[in-house]
A protein has these predicted regions:
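Bacterial Sec-dependent N-terminal signal peptides
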Residues: 1, 7-52
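Active-site mouth of glycoside hydrolases
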Residues: 53-339, 344-386, 392-483
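Histidine-centered catalytic/metal-binding microenvironments
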Residues: 487
Length: 487
């Protein structure tokens, strides 16, 4: 109903009084709603998980524990979890809740989530929206999304590994911090045409991957850029969840803090390697000083992410504030099943009447996988660090991307990886890459505000994602998760 003009004519004094009263009333309502949110969170958590999930994950003698019970897990990557939990652009809380329910029902109790997303907007190969748009300037809707995600995880007795930074370009990462401190530099051209000068971080899909890697290798040499990254760590580790009222350092839904996604020094020289170890040491000690309750790890790919230097891998994972080691395995990206697939702008689908290398070469992928795991385990043996395979992925048959399309090769590979975790004792847990769930994929290459899947914006959507429609893969995951929990 519209009020008459006369009914809206009040004196300035009366208006001010009413505004003051309204502000007080709204403040009381806000506090009441926050208390109600907290109450219903605690009530639902107590109802669903009475007596469970009260401990932090710890490490003892190279194993994870929850209280006195060994903790082994099958998890997934859900880098977009905080964005999906937002009520702003890109957010969809209804979908997030449903995805978490699906994950729980499959037996997945661990998710690896990005708490970065940095720098300039408008780059097609970057995720959107960004969490940190300028140094210390944060998108509060995504922070709220992270709080919501952590609350929902705790309700389900699930745990998160949260990573702050990224060596790769798809979330900003190294390059964003260099841009913020005004770094400019020259790199060698990948086409042999000489040297190129860049005022901002090169975009790999436009300027070249070799150009990008040379440029961002300067991150670990740049004290100003690293200082900004440390400020981001302080911001996130000291955060209080707006829905539960709990400090993150006290959260049982948090398993570990992770320094970066696939941190690298990107150059195979002694200076870069030494500075890389120094940075991992500084960041891990900083995190531990702010939060002594939770585990800390690197986010490393393993030897492959350490310039193929196994001793560098060992050095960063035996630092005092690093609790466990991680490795990633990518048979497709690393050429273990052939080199046909390396140009993201090419049509890589395989004709129906042609042999499918994704299926035919899966044994080669399995052989290389166990060799990679064995090497990591051998170099860390006796150091008391569990190893987590926190990323692994495999394409769909014939390099298709659609949900529900054949996954014979992937299913064989997943089965093999899970069998290693179950039987060898060399891997304490894993997170497959990654969860696409119930996303409605509209484009092969991500367009702004398309549904998120686990394939970042620079990759084909569906390349490595596991969808809810992938029933044979989900059954393998479910059986493997259940088997680990029974051990």
């Amino acid at each position: 109903m519209r009020k008459s003009f006369a009914s809206l004519r009040y004196t300035a004094t009366h208006t001010a009084s009413m505004q003051t009263t309204l502000l007080k009333t709204n403040a009381m309502k806000s506090r009441t709603l926050r208390l109600a949110d907290t109450f219903f969170f605690l009530l639902s958590a107590a109802t669903l998980w009475a007596g469970e999930g009260k401990e932090f994950v710890t490490v003892k003698d190279g194993r994870f524990y929850l209280g006195e019970k060994e903790y082994r897990y099958v998890g997934t990557n859900l880098w977009y979890g905080a964005i999906l939990g937002s009520e702003g652009s890109g957010g969809n809380r209804q979908r997030l809740v449903r995805e978490l329910d699906d994950l729980y029902n499959v037996g997945i109790d661990n998710v690896r989530v990005l708490i970065g997303g940095d720098g300039r907007d408008g780059i097609p190969s970057h995720i959107a929206p960004k969490l940190q748009t300028a140094p210390g300037v944060y998108n509060d809707t995504i922070l709220a999304g992270l709080d919501f995600l952590m609350m929902e995880l705790e309700k389900r007795n699930m745990r998160a590994v949260l990573y702050f930074n990224n060596a790769w370009e798809w979330s900003g990462g190294y390059g964003a911090y260099l841009d913020w401190v005004g770094y400019k530099g020259e790199v060698e051209s990948s086409d042999g045409s000489g040297r190129k000068f860049f005022e901002l971080t090169p975009v790999p899909s436009i300027d070249g991957w070799w150009e990008y890697m040379q440029y961002v290798s300067n991150f670990i040499l740049n004290e100003q850029a690293k200082a900004l990254a440390a400020n981001h760590v302080r911001k996130m580790v000291t955060r209080r969840n707006r829905y539960t009222g709990e400090l993150y350092k006290d959260s049982k839904a948090l398993m570990a803090w992770e320094i970066a996604n696939e941190p690298r020094c990107f150059m195979n020289d002694s200076l870069h390697k030494a500075k890389f170890v120094e940075w991992i040491d500084e960041q891990s000690r900083l995190i531990k000083s702010l939060d002594p309750n939770h585990l800390v790890t690197t986010g490393s790919e393993g030897k492959h992410g350490c310039e193929d230097d196994i001793n560098l891998f060992k050095a960063i994972h035996t630092l005092p504030a690093i609790d466990y080691a991680c490795i990633h395995i990518w048979p497709n990206n690393w050429g273990w099943i052939g080199q046909f697939n390396q140009n993201y702008d090419a049509d890589k689908t395989i004709a129906e009447d042609a042999p499918d290398p994704i299926v035919e070469n899966v044994q080669a992928a399995c052989d290389s996988t166990i060799a990679y795991i064995n090497e990591a385990h051998k170099v860390l043996e006796g150091h008391g660090r569990p190893i987590v395979l926190e990323e692994f992925g495999y394409p769909r048959d014939r390099f298709l991307f659609d949900a529900g399309s054949p996954t014979k090769g992937r299913d064989i590979y997943y089965n093999y990886v899970f069998s290693i975790i179950s039987s060898s004792g060399k891997i304490a847990g894993c997170n497959f890459w990654g969860w696409g769930g119930r996303a409605n994929v509209k484009h092969t290459i991500w367009q702004r505000w398309d549904d998120y899947v686990c394939d970042p914006a620079q990759e084909e959507q569906g390349l490595n994602s596991v969808f809810y429609a992938d029933k044979s893969t989900l059954e393998i995951i479910k059986k493997s998760a259940q088997a680990l929990k029974k051990r």
